[in-house]
Every structure is written in C-alpha cells, then in structure tokens.
Amino acid sequence: MKAWHWSVTLVVIYLAIPVILYLLTRKDDRKPLSDIRKRKRTIVLVLGDLGRSPRMLYHARSLARSGHKVDLCGYDGAKPFDEILNNDLIKIHHIPLILNTRKLPFVVFGILKVIRQHWLLISLLYKLRGADYLLVQNPPSIPTLGVVRFYNLFLSTRTKVVLDWHNFGYTILALKLPETHPMVKFAKFYEGFFGGRAFVHLCVTVLMGQAMRKTFGMSGRRIVPLHDRPAFHFKPLSESEKLDVLRDFKETLYDDMTADHKIIVSSTSYTPDENFNILLDALALYDESKLDLPPLRVIITGKGPMMPEFLAKVEKLQLKRVSIRTAWLEFADYPRILGAAHLGVSLHESSSGYDLPMKVVDMFGCGIPVVSVDYAALSELVKTNTNGVAVKGHVEMGNTFMSLFSNRGKLDNIKRGAMIESRNTWDQTWVKTVGPLFDIGEYVQQRPDEDYDFSSSSSDDDH
C-alpha cells in the first residue's frame, strides 16, 4: 500500500474513534421520562487531597443539603469533616495517587504520571457518566480540563460542566519557570482552550472574573464570582470555650505561657507562594523593639515541602519575647485554634494576583482580625483598619504588630470588623449565588453577573 494510503487510513481511524465512542455511549446519556422525578446527581471533582480541598467539600455539602446526589472524587489523604463522611447522599470515589516509587527522572515520571492520570480520570468519569452536573476545581488544569472536555463531548453530553476557578494553573507553573518558557505558554493555552467552554465559570474574586474575560476571551455572561465564606464549623468562641482550647493544648501549643501573652496564628502548606521570611523578619523587629510590648506566642499550622527549611530558620532566630509552635491539626481542632487567637496572619502571595487566601476566610469566620500580605485582589476581602490590615513587606508587618498590641483600641476596632465578617456564611452566599445554577431555588433579583462589569459581545459557549 502506498504511503499516502496509510496516512489517509490513520486519519480516518483517528477521527472515527470519538464518533464510535459517541455512538456507544449516546444511549446511556439520555434521560428516560421515568427518571424525571429522580434526584439530580452532581459529580464534584478535584485532582487533589479531598480533606485539604475545603471549598469543594463545601460545594458537596451544599448540594447534598439541597437534595442532590453527590459523587465526590479526589485523592485520599486528610480526613474530610463528618458531615461529608456521614451523608447518605454523598459517595466518595478516591482517585489513586501516583507516586514515583521507581525513582524515575523528573521529566520521565511527569510524562508517565500525566498519561496514567488521563486513564484514571476517563475510567472514573465513564463509570459516573450521565450526571446532571460536573463541578470541577481548577487548578490543577493538566490533565483535568482536557479529560473533562472529552467526557462532556463524547461520554456524557447532557452533563453541564461547572468550573470553579481558584487560580490560574499556568501562573503557578510560572513560579518555577520563566513566563516565556514553552511549558508555561503551553499550560496557558491548554487552560484557556479546554477550560473556556464550560456551562458556567465560578471564580473566587471579581478581579479574577475580569481577568478570565481578558486572558481567555470568555463570555462575561457565564462568569459568576463566588467569594469564599466560612463554613458552619468556623465561628467565634466564647471566653469559656477559649479557656477549654488553652487547657486542651497546654502541653503542646500553649506551654509556658502567661496571662500577658498575645496569640498570633497562621496556617500554611509551606509552598513557594508564601514567603515566611516576611513573618520571621517582622517577629524579629517586634522582639528587638524598645517599646513595652506583650510577649507573643505564634502558632503555625499545616505541613508541606518547605517545612524543614522554615524550622531551620526559626532555630537560628533565638527570639526572647516571641515563641513559635508548629502543628498539624485534625479538621475539628483547626477552627478551635483559630478562635483562641488574638490575631491571624496570612503570607499568601498570589501567583496570579487574582485569588484570595482561604485561611483569611476561616479566620474571619472565627471572628479574628487578620494581617495579610497585600496584592491586587486582597481588597475584596481584607479592609485595612476595618477587619484587618494589608501590609507590604516585613517592616510594615512588624510595625503593625507593635501598633496593634500597644494600642488596644486599634485591635478592638478591627476585631469588631472581623466579628461582622463572621456572620457572612457560606450557606447564605451559596444558596443565593450558586444554587439556581444547579436548579436549586431561583434568582429573586438580578442575575449575579449583572452586579459586575462582565458584559461581553462574544457568543455563548457550546455547553
């Protein structure tokens, strides 16, 4: 057979594969009339540790509370909260975690991992095909968005895909590689090409929604900002509850403390988008100050790849009136530790400038004010001198600590603002903003996108 014959044959086979898959699965994709009164079903997918994906857990909880059956998919790891584990409408599907047990070179392992992830995701989604909705976290973008697009085109065309944008995946890759690197450019193209055709795009800030229009050319009518809000278990503690926390963790986190101590809390995953040198240098300034300042107990929760580096830096500081403790907490204990603090700290430096730190939302839920490193979108959450203080660099952070702990009126003022924030709960926001997208309730006023400058003349997406 001539060479061009082989070429034509291969092209025909390549094009025939999705057509065959479509024909084979189309009959399973149609909803019989007898199923009209059945509960709606939503797949909630995150290619990450379920227990460390609070926003997706909150989505699953809200959907189940509204009567949806939920297939919750992600890695096994940290334990989700009990209302997820004990809910009969939520079924958890663990995605196998792929580890480099054979010590392969980074590039080789990365390629094999992505290939394996494609197969695992397609197999799982094929098993769950026919759902009414598929709610997906982004990032990670690769291979999630490509697989989801394939699923929606060929395996379950009736499913409405909702992407929940927590950040831009390509900007996270750009923390390790130059923005001009071919891999970063490919990741940006991949994210826009496969992510741009969802039924609806949720995003964590208004600024991110505007960037999605500008960067990826998305239709503004399909972008719905959903600010993170504290879930039900993040709430202010009474004075007696705070004393219970201090007593329960006296041997580990609150040892050798006096009544004069002020407690600062921060949480982290010890990754490059958080610069802990800012906090450590700020604490050093506080420690060296000549002012009459109270001693500090700084509690840092979490774990991650850069933790050993952080602990080594703490050892070298030799602070006198500042002491630091670290801990990895159970899900139920985390809100209690937050609620017992006088002040929260966020060191999150957004890779894109458009996302918001979930830890600040959690802290506000517990009614504690926050000092946060400033960046573009932060003002949508932290209002300086109202519910916290936004700072640039360690000098401003150190001076803020000194100002707040030497002037009770300033600390009390932002404490009041944080207590007001604690009343804005996830449940209230979700039902009003997102519920109608899943046929839960209806918009009683304007559509959510009409609150923002997202209008666009571009045509709507396919699905």
Curated annotation (Swiss-Prot):
CDD domains cross-referenced by the UniProt entry: GT33_ALG1-like
Residue numbers on the Lumenal membrane side: 1-3, 127-463
Domain of life: Eukaryota
GO BP term, pick one: dolichol-linked oligosaccharide biosynthetic process
Topological region Cytoplasmic: 25-105
Intramembrane region list: 106-126
Entry keyword Signal: no
Enzyme class: transferase
Membrane topology qualifier: Single-pass membrane protein
Gene Ontology cellular component terms for the protein in this record: cytoplasmic side of endoplasmic reticulum membrane; endoplasmic reticulum
Keyword vocabulary terms for this entry: Endoplasmic reticulum, Glycosyltransferase, Membrane, Transferase, Transmembrane, Transmembrane helix
Catalytic reaction list: an N,N'-diacetylchitobiosyl-diphospho-di-trans,poly-cis-dolichol + GDP-alpha-D-mannose = a beta-D-Man-(1->4)-beta-D-GlcNAc-(1->4)-alpha-D-GlcNAc-diphospho-di-trans,poly-cis-dolichol + GDP + H(+)
Protein name: Chitobiosyldiphosphodolichol beta-mannosyltransferase
